[in-house]
Amino acid sequence: LHTNDAPSAITRLNEMGVEPFLTGAAVTGVLAQRLARKLCTHCCEMYQPSVDELLQSRVAADVALASDGMAFYRKRGCPRCNQTGYKGRVGVYQLLTMNETIAQLAVARASREDVERAAMEAGMRSLWDDGLSKVAAGLTSVEELARVLV
């Protein structure tokens, strides 16, 4: 099922003609994923970009401001990664776990925004949040995260 995020899968099933009560009863969870290129561990370097640099790389303003004090890594390039700065892939995930509230929203044919709000209140993380944790761990770059999520 192709959607932009996990909450969209609930509304997409309705759009495809799946009876809403079946969505609420049969779906236990939805996992959205993106694959980001993994920074080469042999040549990446830590740096602290300015907020302007983050905004220029298409990272939303609220994410840029929330990242204050966070460590960032960037690609350099070496023989081990063929001068690309990347080697391998890392998953960026969003897991929506079905609960009674979300099941009721599915039956009511609620909007994607309402489903997302309920899922976030139940503990779902956004793709951005998971991606930023991968950036902070030095697994990928903020530029790569913006590339796969925007």
Regions found by a protein language model. Name each.
Residues 1-150:
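Short, flexible helix-loop junctions that flank or precede catalytic/ligand sites
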